[in-house]
Amino acid sequence: MFESEFARTEYIEKDRVVFHIWKKEAHFDDYRKPVIDSLEMLREHKNSIFIVDARNGFEDVKEDVEWGFDYFLPELKKTGCKVWGFILPVVSDIEGEIDLWTAEIEKNFRVIRAESYDEILKTANDCMFNER
């Protein structure tokens, strides 16, 4: 588990989920450190689902978006992760940010947007069952 004033990340074994919760706005190292810790958990627990609670979300600075697209997403793909879930309210103040990330993430991952952890998990499990 990782926890800072900006984020909390944990592996939930029963669900095979790396759960990343943003607590408040973070940029540069305060943003990247929790994301790297999530990545390490995803490397350790191959083929896990990645769920990001973005209800306390924020607009990323340009440098963090570039870092995410150029470093994080290619590394995430190597972990075997196939599903990325966003926990968000029906209407979010960061729609543009989520749309930007979703467009890039969907190139390699199934994106699920829902209002709860359980809703994402159910949808992810249904999708994986239907792919068999």
Spans of features found by a protein language model:
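Amphipathic, Lys/Arg-enriched alpha-helical "gate/interface" segment within cytosolic domains
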Residues: 1-132
